[in-house]
């Protein structure tokens, strides 16, 4: 059972992880008391990174009285979620799948290349077209890695 809201947890994670050298990618409160935290850093995440963050967060959550049954620390994976403007800037030139809250030109799902992000507007090119999507209109966005064999 959780003691504290998801906003409390997010605030704690956003204050703690950068001091350890990690970026908070996302977190989720899963069934049966599991708290999953997805972290990243330049060069990727190792098992040792996950252990370091787990040990540190366990202590922080104990002090802050945040209860959970299981704490899982993980990398976001190759298809990591994109949530902030900085994510779209960092991954410009890569492919992504974006689902919007409201349709743009009668379409809510876009798969294309991230061209960039300025003034909280993401530019994506697909099928020879370019579309601009306001961050506030993005419901979900994930990198879509290309595998070349």
Swiss-Prot record:
Show the InterPro entries listed in the entry.
Ribosome_maturation_RimP, RimP_C, RimP_C_sf, RimP_N, RimP_N_sf
Give the superkingdom in one word: Bacteria
PANTHER family, per the entry: RIBOSOME MATURATION FACTOR RIMP (PTHR33867:SF1)
Q: Which gene name belongs to this protein?
A: rimP
What is its subcellular localisation?
A: Cytoplasm
Q: Does the keyword Endoplasmic reticulum apply?
A: no
What does the UniProt keyword field contain?
A: Cytoplasm, Ribosome biogenesis
Q: What protein am I looking at?
A: Ribosome maturation factor RimP
Any GO BP annotation: translation
Record organism: Neisseria gonorrhoeae (strain NCCP11945)
The record's similarity note reads: Belongs to the RimP family.
Major subcellular site: cytoplasm
């Amino acid at each position: 059972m959780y003691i504290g809201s998801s906003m409390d947890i997010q605030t704690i994670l956003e204050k703690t992880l950068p001091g350890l050298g990690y970026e908070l990618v996302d977190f989720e409160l899963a069934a049966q008391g599991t708290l999953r935290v997805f972290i990243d850093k330049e060069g990727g995440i190792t098992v040792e990174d996950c252990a370091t963050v787990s040990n540190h967060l366990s202590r922080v959550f104990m002090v802050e009285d945040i209860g959970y049954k299981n704490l899982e620390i993980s990398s976001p994976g190759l298809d990591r979620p994109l949530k902030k403007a900085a994510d779209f800037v960092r991954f410009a030139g890569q492919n992504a799948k974006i689902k919007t809250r409201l349709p743009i030109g009668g379409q809510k799902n876009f798969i294309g290349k991230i061209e960039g992000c300025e003034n909280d507007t993401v530019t994506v090119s697909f099928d020879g077209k370019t579309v601009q999507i306001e961050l506030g209109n993005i419901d979900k966005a994930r990198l879509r890695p290309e595998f070349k064999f």
